[in-house]
Regions:
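Acidic/histidine-rich catalytic neighborhood
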Residues: 15-73
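Surface beta-strand/loop "capping" patches
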Residues: 229-249
């Protein structure tokens, strides 16, 4: 970003990072920062009972990392407290090789409440770039389980885009395309372009935004991706053309 952009948003970035730092709780006994009391993106989890939801943990790490880079670009030293959080933020909780909906959701794969709504765990390495909290092998296992077993009848329009972005980053391009083309009611787009959810909700802009973002990412790539159109299968069946897009982080 230009110096003008750095100066314009420096106070907003710093204040956001300070809030995020203050919101987390430091567990003295285990020597780690934990997140609790937040309303998770997967709305079937209750904020009062939820500790360390995976998407939010990854978002904390990403946002604090961006705030540190902002300081460096301004010629400032890194904030030592923020660095401590980056080093000691809780990793994503997993069980039997699968990421949990939250550290406290130990019945993630037994209770349909945890396998309905947004599969936000995939957003931890889909919407967001890879961070040290995420292991790709466990995320691939989780994607495969979600693909085969999720309660897809209880999803929302942007869930398909989130799944596609996770699959693309993992190199599972067949699932990336398959997610965007999945034949589910909430993945319906009407002739006027609106993402139909049900008779009550015929306009759902998060679905449109998710579709546009995921396709752009699959075309232009992301930091560390290789080759052209990295989110599409290289089986000779795709002729992808685009212009004016920038890679995702």
């Amino acid at each position: 970003p230009s110096q003008e952009v750095l100066d314009k948003y420096k106070d907003l970035v710093a204040a956001t990072a300070e809030f995020m730092y203050s919101f987390a709780t430091y567990d003295e006994l285990e020597g780690r920062f934990v997140l609790k009391g937040a309303i998770p993106a997967q709305e079937t989890l209750r904020a009062a009972d939820t500790v360390n939801p995976p998407f939010e943990l990854s978002y904390w790490h990403y946002a604090i990392s961006v705030a540190q880079k902002w300081r460096e670009r301004l010629g400032l030293e890194r904030n030592l407290q923020w660095d401590e959080m980056l080093d000691k933020l809780s990793p994503l909780a997993y069980q039997d090789g699968l990421y949990l909906a939250a550290e406290t959701a130990t019945d993630t794969y037994k209770d349909i409440r945890f396998t309905s709504d947004h599969m936000a765990v995939l957003g931890a390495y889909g919407i967001l770039p890879k961070c040290p909290l995420v292991r790709e092998d466990i995320m691939q296992n989780t994607l495969d389980w979600v693909w085969d077993n999720w309660n897809w009848g209880k999803t929302w329009g942007w869930d398909f885009a989130m799944t596609a972005m996770d699959a693309a980053r993992l190199g599972d391009t067949e699932k990336a395309v398959g997610a965007l083309l999945m034949d589910k009611r909430t993945n319906t787009y009407l002739p006027n372009g609106h993402n139909y959810q049900d008779a009550r909700l015929r306009v759902y802009l998060p679905g449109n935004g998710g579709l546009l973002t995921s396709v752009a990412m699959m075309c232009a790539g992301w930091d560390g991706s290789e080759g052209e159109n990295p989110g599409f299968p290289k089986d000779g069946n795709w002729d992808v053309r685009w212009e004016g897009l920038q890679p995702m982080p």
